[in-house]
Curated annotation (Swiss-Prot):
Gene3D superfamilies from the UniProt entry: Thrombospondin type-1 (TSP1) repeat
Species: Bos taurus (Bovine)
Region annotation Disordered: where it falls in the sequence: 472-516, 595-799, 828-849
Full protein name: Thrombospondin type-1 domain-containing protein 1
Extracellular topology ranges: 25-413
Length: 849
C-alpha cells in the first residue's frame, strides 16, 4: 500500500512538472512488482507531450549492476502506447529501471533528451522444502523435496540450474556454546529448474541426533544467487521414532518390538513396557520392564511371563532414560492375549525298542490347559529319536527295523560288520584246521634221529611228556632170549625187549596208510617205566632239577614200534661183551645210555657162529612230527574208553637219594628156544638214517665186519647170513631177563617201509587183534596156550612174549610168584576193566622206549 501511494505521488509530481513546463512525457508500469523466474511479463505505458514523439526508446536496466538488459523503440508520431517485457529478462530478484529517451530530428545537432524512467522491484519465487524417508528397506538415505506454486518461465534457451545443498550437523546452534566444534557435513546436488521435485541424499554417520539445513541456490553465469535456505531441521522431530509391532497377538514365547528410527539417526535408548489402565491424575505409570538398546541396535523382546492371562492392552515407550527421568520419544500400544494353554516338561526317554543294534526311543509331554476338551498347545506332544547300542552280542538282522528312519550309514555300523566278518572267518578257519588235523594225513618222519638224543629232531615235546617216535616198519617177531645176537657192527644195543609183528600182505598197503591214529605209541610198564625214570633222572641232574612230571599213555590198541635210541642199543651191546669193559671214548659216547637193571652177564656168543636173526639188521632212525599226547588224544576221540586217555606218573628225584636194589625175577622155567637159521626178512642199510652215527661198542664183537659195518656213514649192501652161534662160555644156564634183553639188541635196527608210518587202517587193526601174527613155519614153535586173550590175562602173568609166532602172551615158562604176577599184570597196573575185551590188550605189537 505504501508503495502504491509512493508511485502515485511520483506520478502526480511528473504530471505537475509536465504541466508546469508544458511537457507531458512519462512512463507508467502496469504492475509495480514482479516475480523472478515466473512466466508473467512486465508492461510499461508511455505518454508523450503535444502528440509528437519521434525516435523515442525504452531501456530495461538492472539497478545493481547498471547493465542494460534490453531496449524497445516506440513508433514515430505515437504519443502513447504500451510496451511488454518478457519473463526471461527477469532471472534474478532485484531492482530494475525502465528509462525512456528521445532524439530531435529537425535539427542537425542533437537535442539533449529529457529522460523519463520507472522503477520495478523483482522478487524470488517461494520454494517449499520437504524431507521424507526413501523407503522402509533403504535406511541409509532420505529425500529432499523442492516445490513452488509459481508458474515458471519457459526459457527459450538454456534454463538456469538449481543447486540443492544439504548440511548435516549433530547439534543446534544455540546448544553449541561451551562445547567442542560441532560436526558439520555438507552434501549438494545440481538439478534443473522445476516446479516440484524430490532429490535423494545419502545419510552420513552423524549419531543419535541429526539436524539438516537445506539451501536452494540459483546458478547463473558467473555468480550464484541464493534463492532460499531452511534449517536446521531436527530429523528426530521431523520423522520421529516408530515402534513396529502387531496390533494384536497371542503370546506364546515372547513379544518382539522393533524400533524404526528417523533417517540418518542411529538408535540408542530404552524401551519400557507398562500396562494400560485408568489412573488417577498425577499417577505415574508402573513400568513392567525396560530393555536397553545399544547404539545401532533396533530389536528387543519381552517374555510372556510379564503379561497377565487373558486379553490386555500394553504400551511400549521408547526414549532416553536418565537417573532422574524418562523422556519418551515414541509410544505405541497393542493388545496382547496370553493363553493358559502351555506345554509341560518333557518326560524321560523311553527304553530303546531294540536290545542291540539300531532302535527307536520316544518321549512325551502334556499340554497344560484349563479346557482339556480343546487343547490349544501348538507343537507335537511326542517325539522320537534313533538309538543305537554298540555293545550288541548278537548279529544284526538282515533287514532293518520298520520303525528305524532312513539315515546315512554310520561309522560304528561299518566297524560292527567288519568285526563280525573277522570273527566268522576265524571260526571257519579254526573248524577247517581242526578237521584237517583230525582227518588229514600226518607228516612223515623223515629226519634221522641224532645220536644220544631222547627226541628226534622233528619231534615236538608237549610240556614234560615223553616223546616217542614211531617207526613205519612192518611188525615182526622177537627172537629168543638166548638166540638173538648181542650186537652187530655199528648197531647200538637195545636194553628193552620188544616184538614186531609180521608185515601185512600187499593188499593191505592202502588200508594201512589211511589211518595214522590207530598206530599210536604205547608203553609197557613197569620195567620200561623204570628205565624211562632212570633216563629222566639223568636229564634232571644235567638240568639241575629236583622234581618233574612225565606223562605216559596207555591204549587198548596194539602197540607200535618207535625209534630206538642208539645210545640205549650201544649200552646193551656193551653189557653183552666179555668183561664189560669200555674205552673212555665209548664211555663218553654212552653217557646217557640205559643199562639193564639186572646185572647178570649174558653168555658170550661167537661172532662167526651166530646166524642173523630175523630182526638182525639196522633200521633207519625216524623222528615223528606228532607227539604221543596228540596221537593218543586222536585215538581217544575215535574210540570210547572206560578210563581217561591220559595217565600221569610223577617222579620226584633228588641227588641225595640212594638207589634201591633191583628186584630179580625168577626165570627158572625159562628154556632156550632155537632161532631160524636164516633171516627171511633181511633189509638193506638205511644210508640216510645211519649216516653220521658213531660206531658203537657192539662193533668189537664182529671184527671181520669192521670194513663193512654201518659206522658213521652206514653200509649200503645187504647183510649176509651168519652161521648159527655156539656157546663159548660155561654150560648153558637159565637166562634171566637181562639175558633176554641183551639178546634182543638187534631187534631195533631193521628199517621199515614208509607205508607203516601212518599205521594200519581200522579194518586191518581189528584183524590184527584177532590174528596178531601169521602162523610160524613148520620148524618153528607151536602155541603153548589156546586160551583167549581175556582168559589169558586172568590166569597168566602178562609178561614179555616168548615167541613172535605166539598171538597171545604165554607165561608158563616163567616161574613168578603171585606178588610178582600182580605187579606185572598190566590191566591191574593200569586199573583197567578186566571184562573189557579191548582195554589194554597187549597184542603182538612193537614196544617203545
Amino acid at each position: 500500500m505504501k508503495q502504491t501511494l509512493k508511485d502515485f505521488s511520483n506520478l502526480l509530481l511528473v504530471v505537475l512538472c509536465d504541466y508546469v513546463l508544458g511537457e507531458a512525457e512519462h512512463l507508467v508500469l502496469g504492475e509495480p512488482g514482479h516475480v523472478a523466474l515466473s512466466n508473467s511479463t512486465v508492461t510499461v505505458d508511455f505518454h508523450g507531450a503535444n502528440g509528437t514523439l519521434r525516435n523515442v526508446s525504452v531501456l530495461l536496466v538492472e539497478a545493481s549492476s547498471n547493465q542494460t538488459l534490453t531496449t524497445k523503440y516506440l513508433l514515430t508520431n505515437q504519443s502513447q502506447g504500451t510496451l511488454e517485457f518478457e519473463c526471461f529478462y527477469f532471472k534474478e530478484a532485484g531492482d530494475y529501471w525502465f528509462v525512456m529517451t528521445r532524439e530531435a530530428t529537425n535539427s542537425s545537432l542533437p537535442v539533449p533528451p529529457r529522460e523519463r524512467s520507472a522503477f520495478l522491484k523483482v522478487e524470488w519465487p517461494v520454494f517449499h522444502v520437504d524431507l521424507s524417508r526413501t523407503s522402509m528397506a533403504a535406511e541409509g538415505t532420505f529425500q529432499v523435496g523442492l516445490f513452488t506454486s509459481q508458474p515458471l518461465c519457459p526459457f527459450p534457451g538454456d534454463k538456469p540450474d538449481i543447486l540443492l545443498e544439504v548440511t548435516f550437523t549433530n547439534s543446534l546452534p544455540e546448544a553449541r556454546a561451551g562445547q567442542a566444534l560441532p560436526l558439520e557435513i555438507r552434501a549438494s546436488k545440481r538439478v534443473e529448474l522445476a516446479q516440484g521435485q524430490w532429490v535423494e541424499f545419502d545419510c552420513p554417520p552423524v549419531g543419535p541426533e541429526a539436524y539438516v539445513t537445506v539451501t536452494v541456490v540459483l546458478k547463473l553465469l558467473g555468480r550464484d544467487s541464493v534463492i532460499m535456505s531452511t534449517g536446521p531441521i531436527d530429523l528426530a522431530q521431523k520423522f520421529g521414532y516408530k515402534l513396529v509391532m502387531e496390533p494384536e497377538l497371542t503370546c506364546e514365547a515372547g513379544v518382539e518390538v522393533t524400533v524404526l528410527p528417523p533417517p540418518c539417526i542411529f538408535v540408542q535408548g530404552v524401551i519400557a513396557v507398562f500396562k494400560e489402565a485408568p489412573r488417577l491424575p498425577g499417577e505415574r505409570t508402573n513400568r513392567l520392564a525396560e530393555n536397553s538398546l545399544a547404539l545401532g541396535e533396533r530389536r528387543t523382546g519381552f517374555n510372556c511371563t510379564l503379561f497377565d492371562m487373558g486379553r490386555n492392552k500394553y504400551c511400549f515407550d521408547f526414549g532416553v532414560s536418565s537417573q532422574s527421568q524418562f523422556s519418551a520419544k515414541e509410544k505405541e500400544c497393542m493388545l496382547i492375549r496370553r493363553s493358559i494353554e502351555t506345554w509341560g516338561l518333557w518326560q524321560p526317554w523311553s527304553q530303546c525298542s531294540a536290545s542291540c543294534g539300531d532302535g527307536v526311543r520316544e518321549r512325551r509331554r502334556v499340554c497344560l490347559t484349563s479346557s482339556p476338551s480343546r487343547p490349544g498347545c501348538p507343537g507335537m506332544s511326542s517325539e522320537t529319536s534313533p538309538c543305537s547300542l554298540e555293545d550288541c552280542a548278537a548279529f544284526q538282522p538282515s533287514s532293518p527295523s520298520p520303525l528305524q528312519p532312513q539315515a546315512p550309514v554310520k561309522s560304528n555300523n561299518v566297524v560292527t560288520v567288519t568285526g563280525i566278518s573277522l570273527c566268522l572267518f576265524i571260526i571257519v578257519a579254526t573248524v577247517l584246521i581242526t578237521l584237517w588235523r583230525k582227518l588229514g594225513r600226518a607228516p612223515k618222519c623223515s629226519t634221522p634221529a641224532r645220536h644220544n638224543s631222547l627226541h628226534g629232531p622233528g619231534c615236538r615235546k608237549n610240556s614234560d611228556e615223553e616223546n616217542i617216535c614211531e617207526l613205519s616198519e612192518p611188525r615182526g617177531s622177537f627172537s629168543d632170549a638166548g638166540d638173538g645176537p648181542a650186537g652187530s657192527p655199528g648197531d647200538p644195543g637195545i636194553p628193552l625187549t620188544y616184538r614186531r609183528s609180521v608185515p601185512a600182505p600187499p593188499d593191505d598197503e592202502a588200508s594201512g596208510s589211511e589211518s595214522f591214529q590207530a598206530n599210536a605209541q604205547k608203553i609197557i610198564p613197569p620195567l620200561f617205566s623204570y628205565r624211562l625214570a632212570q633216563q629222566q633222572l639223568k636229564e634232571m641232574k644235567k638240568k639241575g632239577l629236583t622234581e618233574t612230571t612225565k606223562v605216559y599213555h596207555v591204549s587198548q590198541s596194539p602197540l607200535t614200534d618207535t625209534a630206538i635210541d642208539a645210545a640205549a642199543t650201544a649200552a646193551a651191546a656193551a653189557a653183552a661183551s666179555p668183561g664189560g669193559s669200555e674205552s673212555p671214548e665209548e664211555a663218553a659216547a654212552g653217557k646217557f645210555r640205559i643199562k639193564s637193571p639186572f646185572l647178570e652177564h649174558p653168555p658170550t656168543v661167537g661172532a662167526g657162529d651166530r646166524p642173523p636173526s630175523r630182526l638182525d639188521h639196522p633200521f633207519s632212525a625216524a623222528s615223528c612230527a606228532v607227539s604221543p599226547s596228540q596221537t593218543l588224544l586222536r585215538k581217544s576221540q575215535v574210540r570210547s574208553h572206560s578210563r581217561g586217555s591220559h595217565f600221569r606218573r610223577t617222579a620226584s628225584f633228588h641227588e641225595a637219594r640212594q638207589a634201591r636194589p633191583f628186584r630179580e625175577r625168577s626165570l627158572s622155567t625159562l628154556t632156550p628156544r632155537p632161532t631160524p637159521a636164516h633171516g627171511p626178512r633181511a633189509r638193506t642199510w638205511d644210508q640216510a638214517g645211519e649216516r653220521g652215527r658213531p660206531p658203537s661198542r657192539g662193533t668189537a664183537l664182529f671184527p671181520e665186519k669192521r670194513d663193512h659195518g654201518p659206522g658213521a656213514a652206514g653200509a649200503s649192501g645187504p647183510l649176509s647170513p651168519l652161521p648159527k652161534p655156539h656157546s663159548l662160555g660155561p654150560p648153558p644156564r637159565k637166562p634171566d631177563l637181562g639175558d633176554r634183553q641183551a639178546g634182543f639188541v638187534g631187534a631195533g635196527e631193521r628199517p621199515e617201509p614208509p607205508r607203516a608210518r601212518r599205521g594200519p587202517s581200522p579194518s586191518h587193526r581189528s584183524v590184527s587183534r584177532k590174528q596178531p601174527s601169521p602162523p610160524a613155519p613148520k620148524d618153528g614153535y607151536q602155541r603153548v596156550s589156546p586160551l583167549s586173550p581175556s582168559q589169558g590175562r586172568k590166569d597168566k602173568c602178562q609178561s614179555f612174549p616168548a615167541h613172535p609166532e605166539f598171538a597171545f602172551y604165554d607165561n608158563t615158562s616163567f616161574g613168578l610168584t603171585e606178588a610178582e604176577q600182580r605187579m606185572l599184570d598190566l590191566p591191574g597196573y593200569f586199573g583197567s576193566n578186566e571184562e573189557d575185551e579191548t582195554t589194554s590188550t597187549l597184542s603182538v605189537e612193537k614196544l617203545v622206549i
